[in-house]
Amino acid sequence: MDNVDFATLSIFDIDKEGKQRTDTMPSPDNHREQTKIALFHGGVDKHFYDNGFQVEDDRVTNDTFDGYDMVLLGDIHKRQFLNKEETIAYPGSLIQQNYSEEPSHGFLLWDVEKRKATYHQVENDYGYKIIFVENGLIRNKMKFVPPKGNIKIKYTNTTLEQLKNIQIDLRKKYPKLKDIVTERQDNISIGDDRENKLDISYITDV
């Protein structure tokens, strides 16, 4: 790539207290090329996790990368931009990693000259889906169910028989599902607790 210089702030550059150093970040003035891109794998400034929780890093901030045209970040799995110009960004993980992450994942494709990124989704048949069941009925929308993925059923006020029937229906509709697990959300007794803890993967072939 012509006329582009990359600079990296290493997560291994830490002080005696184990905190991230920023004085090792190369100055953009040391680069002669027209476009200067900074790279870092770690938490920067105010950023969000997939659970919606926001954290703030007071060691590495947006100002750490002043003078760079774009900052490409890693580590945080949630896709987000950290400045209004949208030149400092986490692309997020390439595919969904667990139940806490949203199903939409992919990568950012950068137009270096325009300093703009476009999001491209990567289709994934092996994702994760949480299904909420109340009174024996599925309550959330079923717009996206990974056909070869993992399902977690969170249920309340639902009998064991109702729960098994829901799993049977899911297996019929999505026969290639990898796993279905259940998680009770209330204290209502729905039968023998020992039975509730059984792995009911035997319905895989139904």
What are these regions (language model features)?
Residues 70, 74-126, 132-134:
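A conserved active-site cap/scaffold subdomain adjacent to cofactor or substrate pockets
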Residues 15, 22-29, 38, 84, ...:
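A structural signal for the main folded, soluble domain(s) of proteins
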Residues 2, 31, 83, 103, ...:
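A generic structural signal for short, non-catalytic loop/turn and secondary-structure boundary residues
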Residues 112-206:
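Accessory, non-catalytic peripheral segments of nucleic-acid enzymes
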Residues 35, 104-105, 148-150:
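Short, surface-exposed beta-edge/turn micro-motifs
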Residues 3-11, 105-106, 191-203:
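Short, surface-exposed amphipathic charged segments that create phosphate/polyanion-binding patches used
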Residues 1-88:
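His/Asp/Glu-rich metal-coordinating catalytic cores
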